[in-house]
Amino acid sequence: MNSQVIIFDTTLRDGEQALQASLSVKQKLQIALSLENTGIDIIEVGFPISSPGDFKSVQTISKNIKNSRICSLARCLDKDIDAAAEAMHSSNAFRIHIFLATSILHMESKLKKNFDQIIDMAITSVKRALRYTDDVEFSCEDASRTTMDNLCRIVEKLINAGVKTINIPDTVGYTVPNELSSIIHNLFQRVPNIDKSIISVHCHNDLGMAVGNSISAIQAGARQIEGTINGIGERAGNTALEEVIIAIKVREDVLGVSTKIKHKEIYRTSQIISQICNLPIPPNKAIVGSNAFAHSSGIHQDGVLKNRKNYEIMEPSSIGLKEVKLNLTSRSGRAAVKHYMTEMGYRECDYKIDELYASFLKLADKKGQVFDYDLEALAFINQQQEELEHFSLSFFSVQSISNGLSTASVKLLCGKKTFIESATTSNGPIDAIYQALNRITHFPIILQKYQLIAKGKGKDALGQVDILVEHKKRKFHGMGLATDIIESSAQAMVNVLNNIWKANQVNEKLKKLKKINN
């Protein structure tokens, strides 16, 4: 049996169904190009008959994708199949993906057809699709709830008709791994021409088993896995392809299969799709979550510093993640604190670890997460966070006009002096406030990340803004919380400015100490 698993991505079709608003043609093309760059074998780019916009998206993507095979969805209707072929005609090679329900529940309550009629519809549609391409895939919708006899019967007839890929969907995420494995195993045992087609699975995550089901299907003989990047999709989502891909790589010793995926592109592609679709990745998400390679426990941090393999089963760089740091929290031990100080260029003789660690624990209990610049302040200024609030926002106002420009006025208390900045105009209220604040402090910064998280529901919900900026090649974090998004954004930037000021104070003190020592 072939040891290569084909990766079929349906982020642009099934995944888009999870979004509150449809993606633009430009956004879909950007995602498709990223998927192609990652080495995805088959990209299902849409359902052309569903809307003129989807037709145009499929058409545009088909003209631009050269290395991955393009695929479009179609019902067992002539107009669907014709539209799919027309939308993809400019592609080097394309696949038409036809689907029809085969479970008794769907046949009786949705389609009002008997099984013989279902078979006739399926075969007729396959023959029409074969006029346009020799690459036809057929999905037996709700296959996991279809009787085994019926499933074997229709699969055999579809293969005889010329279908190259038979897809077995767990449409409602009802199946558990040993059940899906049994279905695939039975197909291989009972369908005489099964070797003439690739068996695929398409799992949904309603019971949280999509990835587990996909892996069990591979072990039973399936050689195509369908899913989406980050597992996005209707209801609880689809199989998270990045998890299946890395599981295949890490556990090749057990699974005995491989893919053609460029693993180092996975993290980048995941982030691109998250941003374009406006679907934040949960921190604890396997493979691509921000905590996937993070360590907070002191015991774990010590073990990782001695040998990453103690608590990591793969290298972060294997998915294209360049920078991985230990989280400094109240659970961190001395080893992690020492590691951060060493990373910043300090020797153990430059500070007293016992005093630093005691101060660190106090700050961590108050603040939650501590950053490198916090450690510097504790080590060399010996002051807690609240004692170092040099800047405080005493007043701000924003006026926006219809052309998109906004004017911000701010009053910032800086130590014992009050500076007033007004009439700073920019594109949008938040950027206007940020420019006004920066003109007061004269800190050259680059905003690298802005994240808004809703805390609660309704008009009184709080908006938490987390930002990450770069200042003189160092990263600084800031957080603001308020019912007004603009206010929380301003608070976050003031938080950043205080952190930069604190770091500058440390640098000035260290310079003076060096002069004295010299």
Curated annotation (Swiss-Prot):
GO MF annotation: an example: 2-isopropylmalate synthase activity
SUPFAM superfamilies the record matches: 2-isopropylmalate synthase LeuA, allosteric (dimerisation) domain (SSF110921), Aldolase (SSF51569)
GO biological process: L-leucine biosynthetic process
Family statement drawn from the similarity comment of this UniProt entry: Belongs to the alpha-IPM synthase/homocitrate synthase family. LeuA type 1 subfamily.
Substrates-to-products reaction catalysed: 3-methyl-2-oxobutanoate + acetyl-CoA + H2O = (2S)-2-isopropylmalate + CoA + H(+)
Gene: leuA
Cofactor(s) required for function per UniProt: Mn(2+)
Annotated function: Catalyzes the condensation of the acetyl group of acetyl-CoA with 3-methyl-2-oxobutanoate (2-ketoisovalerate) to form 3-carboxy-3-hydroxy-4-methylpentanoate (2-isopropylmalate).
Enzyme Commission number, as recorded: 2.3.3.13
UniProt enzyme class: transferase
Subcellular location(s) of the protein: Cytoplasm
Gene3D superfamilies documented for this protein: 1.10.238.260, 3.30.160.270, Aldolase class I
Metabolic or biological pathway, per its Swiss-Prot or TrEMBL entry: Amino-acid biosynthesis; L-leucine biosynthesis; L-leucine from 3-methyl-2-oxobutanoate: step 1/4
UniProt key word Amino-acid biosynthesis: yes
Main location class: cytoplasm
Subunit annotation: Homodimer.
Keyword Cell wall biogenesis/degradation: no
Keywords attached to this entry: Amino-acid biosynthesis, Branched-chain amino acid biosynthesis, Cytoplasm, Leucine biosynthesis, Manganese, Metal-binding, Plasmid, Transferase
GO cellular component labels: cytosol
Binding site residues for Mn(2+): D14, H202, H204, N238
Annotated ranges, domain Pyruvate carboxyltransferase: 5-267
InterPro entries in the record: 2-IPM_HCS-like (IPR050073), 2-isopropylmalate_synth_dimer (IPR013709), AIPM/Hcit_synth_CS (IPR002034), Aldolase_TIM (IPR013785), LeuA/HCS_post-cat (IPR054691), LeuA_allosteric_dom_sf (IPR036230), LeuA_bact_synth (IPR005671), PYR_CT (IPR000891)
The protein's name in its UniProt record: 2-isopropylmalate synthase
